[in-house]
């Protein structure tokens, strides 16, 4: 069954300032890139071309900054038409047709069963799972890492939330989603 509500990701995120969010993407003003970019207005030069890719328009830095800030949660387009762009706006897109995934420390059991029972636990044993879980190849801290909830939202982002507090740890905008953020 479903237990009691532990936290509301949207409400926790809404309580944060837009500037304190860690939103990342991959963008390069000169084409293909493999390096992460912080999705902030101070990085407008690297983000502008990717945001308007294949649109046939060349936006100003001010237009791109407005969009970047809007995606981060600023009311830069005065959505409620009250002549104020300082209003708070909901920062989390609706989570629709996305299934969350919880990732935490490895918990898989192993067994050295002499019967070779073909269970998942035996498979882990013969493939060195125990050594992986506690060794350097798992980043040493693997066995004690915090539990994180990952979910996609209709704001174009993959969000990572701390499973205990609901705090957004970071969000990632896939490069192919950047041109769609204007819609």
Residue ranges and their predicted role:
Residues 1-183:
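A fold-level detector for beta-propeller and closely related beta-sheet-rich head/sensor domains
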């Amino acid at each position: 069954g479903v237990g009691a509500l532990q936290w509301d990701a949207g409400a926790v995120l809404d309580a944060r300032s837009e500037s304190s969010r860690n939103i990342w993407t991959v963008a390069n003003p000169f084409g293909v890139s493999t390096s992460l970019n912080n999705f902030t207005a101070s990085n407008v030069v690297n983000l502008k071309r990717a945001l308007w890719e294949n649109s046939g328009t060349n936006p100003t830095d001010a237009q791109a900054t407005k969009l970047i800030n809007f995606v981060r949660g600023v009311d830069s387009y005065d959505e409620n038409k009250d002549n104020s762009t300082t209003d708070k706006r909901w920062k989390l897109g609706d989570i629709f047709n996305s299934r969350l995934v919880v990732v935490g420390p490895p918990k898989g059991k192993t067994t050295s069963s002499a019967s070779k029972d073909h269970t998942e636990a035996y498979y882990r044993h013969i493939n060195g799972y125990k050594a992986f879980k506690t060794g350097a190849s798992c980043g040493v801290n693997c066995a004690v890492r915090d539990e994180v909830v990952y979910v996609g939202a209709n704001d174009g982002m993959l969000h990572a939330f701390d499973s205990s507090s609901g705090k957004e740890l970071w969000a990632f905008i896939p490069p192919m989603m950047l041109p769609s953020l204007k819609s």
